[in-house]
Amino acid sequence: MEKREFKAESKRLLDIVINSIYTNREIFLRELISNASDAIDKVYYKTLGDSSLTFNKDDYYIKIKPNKEERTLTISDKGIGMTEKELDENLGVIAKSGSLQFKKENEIKDGFDIIGQFGVGFYSGFLVADKITVITKAFGADKAYKWESDGVDGYTISEAEKDSFGTDIILHLKANDEDENYDEFLEEYKLKSLIKKYSDFIRYPIKLDVTKSRVKEGTENEHEEYVEEETVNSMVPLWRRNKNELTDDDYNNFYVEKRFGFDKPLRHMHISVDGMISYNSILYIPENIPYDYYTKEYEKGLELYSNGVLIMEKCSELLPDYFGFVKGIVDSQDLSLNISREMLQHDRQLSRIAKNIKTKIKNELESMMKNDRESYEKFYKSFGRQLKYGVYDDFGMNKDELKDLLMFYSSKEKKMVSLAEYVERMAEDQKYIYYAVGESNERIEKMPQTEMVLDKGYEILYFTEDVDEFAIKMLMNYKEKEFKSVSSGDLGIESEEENKKENEENKGIFEAMKEALGEKISAVKASSRLKNYPVCLSSEGEVSIEMEKILSAMPNNQGVKAQKVLEVNTNHEVFNSLKDALENDKDKFNLYTKLLYNQALLVEGLSIENPVDFTNDICKLMK
């Protein structure tokens, strides 16, 4: 029996296969089952071109046989088998794909699904085995052959005995060590779990002898174990079935079976695409937030399949972060079964699929907002924050993609409205989209800064989440209408002449108030927005008061401060008390000014810088 060397570069390639392409040992079974499925496919294709041959699918299956005594695992198929020449060419040259060659020689169109076209899957067996034996008999041949190798010193090919065509791959498992327990791949539960995980949708039955228990004949309570051959895989992927044959229950049951969630999904999408890219997909939009969704532990991603064989449990490259809540699967014939996570990042087909999926999700959400508002509001309550993060993230790169999906509570409608709905009903003389920021709708409704805007009959959007104002600052405008905080210095509705006159007339008292407060504020001015309140705070520049609150609460904050302006209602009776105090008692004037400033801080939800001084000032006032 002649010892043959692997072809040139094959030793180096074998090392790459074992140590680089495959980073997870357990996928060896997936690879060998996929090869077995391909081998049966080839028999089927042969029969299509020869009327004298028949193909009865019930006769074809894949058998997994563990042997604990000999520490071997055998994967058998009734596939096309290999001749001596094919053994030498296909298994003697690493990264040569017999399936790809078969497609070329038989001019098979891409519609014929053969899983393995990369040519390295067989060698994944060396992840768990220190020797592999292959016994094979080619379809229509008289002789069988045995190929054997330890993966290091080449291989041997010799004649063998085999009754029917097909292939047996016998893995002689490595010895256990401190890091790996290879015996687990001989355990029934482990083999079943790997088949269900990676190869559940292989189109031929995968059979395994399973130990079961039953009541022993002639007894009532005595049990005995027996072995029964069982088909482990379900074979038909839901996503490849006709949509018209499926019910909501089918989709909901699949959602639970795949453990995407334990409640009913809010929406499902069944996608089939053929053209520049080809893939099938079932996607789900959950109704409720996963308990860990807004934590570092949460992993986004879709299950990724190649021809029904699982490549990756969570392929994050298929979803942008702002759609990270979507669950589901993607199956494509255009992806290599052996693709690694590193290779995925540069895979053009995957990028095209991801782009298409992103568009499908956006269209589904837009349709839900338009045609099923109640469901969309449920979704938005759970995941609206994620969309707003998407607007703000990456320097606003995705803001145009997401702006039409945003919703905020409306002062006028008393419910959630979209930006498009707000703009459609804006008054002709209204320059801006007005918003107010606060901890809750109730707090915002009591804000003194809203009085003037509401008196004009203008609608205000309520921002109650930390990310809201950051997202809107990044968005800047919507349909050419700029956003304006009700707390900003210029609302665009005040009379400039009246403001100028008011500030000139009270210049002295405002300068005295500024002097009393020092660097706490950048200016004091007359307010045209206040009716019932004596003072309020507004801001100038890009950083609002609410943004300062959020930034200051963050770890390692940089001490970013808003440029605060104290606005004074000159028509309020308190203002008369201020003027009297300035003329008659400067200390009392300073006391009043500080109290009013602290009052404005409290109304704004800001903390008082020195609570002890504040309480002492109140006591002085009461004397």
UniProtKB/Swiss-Prot annotation:
Superkingdom field: Bacteria
Predominant place of localization: cytoplasm
GO molecular function (one): unfolded protein binding
Annotated stretches, region: B: 342-549
Cellular compartment(s): Cytoplasm
Keyword Disulfide bond among record annotations: no
Chain residue ranges for the region called A: 1-341
Spans through the membrane: none
A single GO cellular-component term on record: cytoplasm
Family, as annotated: Belongs to the heat shock protein 90 family.
Function statement: Molecular chaperone. Has ATPase activity.
HAMAP family: HSP90 (MF_00505)
Protein name: Chaperone protein HtpG
